[in-house]
């Protein structure tokens, strides 16, 4: 038996010894009993046990879910590669377990419907149609859009507006993919890298033109609404009149009748999220009553001073990598801790009233800087074209962060209510809970250096427990998470949450 004195164990130890000294005569036998009793007292007290209660109070209702960016591999043909049928089946198996609340799927028209001035809806469409068929069959909502016009010269051209909306109508009404519920006309229009170059007035006018064109296709606006403004938190283009909260506020003032979903992008730092500063920042965004706000892209970047060591390691790996030149890559996304950080980010979003988030991104094989696969944008949970592009099948295996994100996506499903967790404030812990159809999930991340013991009050019937702990993440033959305990019932549960670990309890299917 090990004996540990927790935070309050020292005080307990002193009280017991004081009592014993006053209660026993000073002889040798009693001194022996004194030692035994003190050891037992210390052993029983163990670490401080935190009492946690998952209440019935709803933080936000009908959560839209945790999802991913899953673009249709439309750059792969230019690399001389394509996703094989076997690889598609692997992808479907993994995403089936993930059960994303929604998918953000962005395309480049130059890779699909537009070729040197010619509009062809069928061109290179196979991968997009396969992806959308999967989402349609599973009832997964899709936020679809275009990164930019297929040629920058078309940015204000009615020809692009007509082509883009015609293609959308073809997908939704002719092909039947009404899983597409929202449409983004520009990716990150506030950016100096984007076609609008931060010009809110231009973007606003294009939103109005796209909406008018959608209205010319009978029935389309009944199925699809515009989403926006799709801007980046903590970025301010000097050429723009607004920062990200300003873009959202102005969009609400000018275009609310056109916008069905508000979305923004977030790439916070590790220290920023773990300290709670990012959660506070989310409170700066205000949207009209009855509308929802999601993080359409989310991940981590380490440019802030507090994350300098992480940035240095990211740069070192990028320089040494044979798969990227470092253009817009998160080289630490394969590290175990990144899975913890994604979970913490999701908890901040859920507890903060934001309606959902999509992690950027599902697969390393989605995008490259330029036209070469030797400069991939590495952000994904795997590279499904690892063998085809680099002769390395091992690149196609899931990275550790997929394990945690699969749990956070599957067990905080679309439509669930996010519940308040009553717990004492403890540094290094983050928690979230949800309920759907009378079944519950409770998840806790311990990013401290010490194990934590929780006495968690949450009713479960036939529940399971998963653990995301480095070196101890059980999987099945497909590399998918397997619970460490099953058949969990009752109203109170003792949980040991390892240092640098995630524990999830659920009786959801």
Label every PLM stretch briefly.
Residues 95-269:
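Substrate-binding cleft and catalytic face of glycoside hydrolase catalytic domains
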Residues 200-345, 352:
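Noncatalytic carbohydrate-binding groove/subsite architecture in carbohydrate-active enzymes
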Residues 37-45:
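Hydrophobic h-region of N-terminal signal peptides that target proteins for export
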Residues 4-5, 9, 19:
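N-terminal amphipathic/hydrophobic targeting modules at extreme N-termini
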Residues 303-406, 417-429:
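Aromatic/acidic polysaccharide-binding cleft in carbohydrate-active enzymes
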Residues 483-509:
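C-terminal beta-strand-rich structural cap/linker in extracellular carbohydrate-active enzymes
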Residues 424-461, 468-471, 500-504:
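Carbohydrate-binding surface patches
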Residues 44-84:
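Mature N-terminal, pre-catalytic/accessory segment of carbohydrate-active enzymes
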């Amino acid at each position: 038996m090990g004996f540990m004195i927790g935070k309050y164990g020292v005080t307990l130890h002193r009280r017991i010894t004081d009592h014993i000294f006053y209660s026993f005569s000073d002889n040798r036998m009693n001194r022996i009993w004194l030692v035994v009793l003190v050891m037992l007292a210390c052993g029983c007290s163990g670490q401080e046990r935190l009492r946690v209660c998952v209440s019935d109070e709803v933080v936000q209702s009908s959560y839209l879910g945790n999802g991913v960016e899953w673009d249709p591999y439309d750059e792969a043909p230019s690399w001389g590669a394509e996703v094989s049928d076997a690889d598609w089946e692997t992808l479907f198996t993994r995403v089936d377990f993930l059960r994303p609340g929604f998918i953000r799927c962005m395309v480049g028209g130059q890779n699909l419907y537009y070729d040197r001035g010619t509009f062809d809806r069928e061109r290179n469409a196979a991968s997009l149609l396969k992806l959308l068929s999967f989402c349609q069959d599973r009832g997964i909502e899709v936020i679809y859009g275009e990164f930019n016009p297929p040629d920058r010269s078309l940015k204000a051209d009615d020809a692009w507006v007509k082509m883009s909306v015609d293609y959308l109508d073809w997908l939704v009404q002719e092909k039947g993919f009404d899983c597409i519920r929202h449409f983004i006309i520009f990716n990150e229009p506030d950016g100096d890298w984007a076609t609008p170059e931060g010009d809110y007035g231009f973007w606003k006018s294009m939103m109005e033109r796209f909406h008018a064109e959608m209205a010319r296709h009978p029935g389309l606006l009944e199925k699809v609404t515009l989403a926006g403004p799709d801007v980046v938190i903590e970025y301010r283009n000097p050429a723009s009149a607004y920062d990200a909260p300003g873009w959202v506020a102005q969009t609400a003032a000018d275009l609310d009748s056109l916008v069905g979903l508000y979305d923004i992008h977030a790439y916070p730092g590790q220290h920023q999220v773990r300290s709670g500063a990012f959660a506070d920042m989310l409170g700066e965004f205000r949207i009209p009553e009855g509308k929802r706000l999601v993080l359409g892209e989310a991940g981590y970047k380490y440019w802030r001073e507090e994350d300098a060591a992480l940035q240095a390691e990211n740069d070192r790996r990028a320089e040494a990598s044979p798969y990227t030149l470092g253009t817009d890559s998160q080289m630490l996304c394969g590290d175990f801790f990144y899975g913890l950080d994604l979970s913490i980010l999701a908890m901040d979003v859920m507890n903060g009233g934001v309606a959902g988030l999509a992690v950027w991104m599902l697969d390393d094989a989605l995008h490259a800087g330029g036209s070469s696969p030797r400069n991939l944008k590495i952000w994904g949970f795997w590279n499904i074209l690892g063998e085809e592009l680099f002769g390395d099948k091992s690149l196609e295996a899931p990275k550790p962060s997929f394990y945690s994100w699969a749990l956070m996506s599957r067990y905080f499903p679309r439509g669930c209510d996010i519940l308040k967790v009553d717990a004492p404030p403890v540094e290094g812990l983050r928690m979230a809970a949800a309920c759907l159809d009378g079944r519950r999930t409770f998840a806790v991340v311990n990013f401290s250096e010490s194990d934590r013991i929780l006495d968690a009050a949450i009713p479960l019937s036939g529940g399971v427990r998963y653990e995301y702990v480095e070196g101890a993440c059980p999987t099945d033959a497909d590399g998918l998470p397997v619970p460490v305990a099953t058949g969990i019932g009752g109203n109170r549960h003792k949980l040991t949450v390892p240092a640098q670990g995630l524990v999830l309890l659920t009786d959801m299917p």
